[in-house]
Every structure is written in structure tokens, then in C-alpha cells.
């Protein structure tokens, strides 16, 4: 739920899964709302929606612990079906040690309900491996508005990673 005070102003990009849960972006209005915190990503059963992420709020790390970095832009989101499935989204953060090289990341709500970062640009898959420079996923299926791909009902996300040495790899990232 959003804190007392702000109200929904505009809704964007609602998605629905087979369990009847929803996820959507919404712009907020009311006391204390400004450009830096006006957009939030909400999700859950319609009767018990919760705020998953909001511009200006602290973004979590891989363990789900809040960091000094804050959400700065939401790029795309999806809502897989299946037991324990939660929202998956691509977003940018800023501040708290975030740089232009590591601001883009993939976040997901895990089977226990914890929001955590799964992967971000400038991560390496091996100790001496090249850094990831680009993540491509959650793109719309051509001609099917509101239909994304890159995820399944068993907690896996597929993505295309581009590395600093210009190589690419198809990766499967499992949501814990």
C-alpha cells in the first residue's frame, strides 16, 4: 500500500498473471509528491496491492537489503505465473555508489516476497570475465501489445547480456 496521503493519479502498463495478481506502474499525487518520487510499481492480488518500488526510495541489493542507491527510472516489468511468482522488472538506480556503468539492473520479488536485485550492468559472470554493459529482456512481442517475454512460470528469466569485450551471451537467471 502507498503511505497515507498520496493518491493514484494515472495508471500505466498493467499486467496480469494466471493467479489473478496484477502489477502496474502508477503516478501519484498529493502532499509530498514531486517529480523525484511520483512513480511507483505496485503488485499483488487486487485486494491487497503493495508498493514494490517507488522513484526516490532505496533500491535493494541481491539479499533484499536496502542500499543507499535509489530508484531513478522504471523501464519495463512483467508478472510471471506459477507458485510464488512475483513481479520482475528492469530499472535504473542512482546515488549510493551507483555509476553510469552499473545503474541498470534486473529486480524481482522472490518466492518469499522479498524484492531483490538479480543482476546489473558492470557485473561480471566470472572473476576475470568482462563486465556486462547491456541487458536486453522483457521486450514486447511484436504485434501483441502488453505481452512480454523473457520469463517462465518456474522462476527463471532469460536475457541477452552484452559484455565490455563486445561478446554476447544468452543467460538464464533464476529468481530465488
Regions found by a protein language model. Give the residues of each.
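Conserved "turn/edge" positions that cap or connect secondary-structure elements
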Residues: 1-176
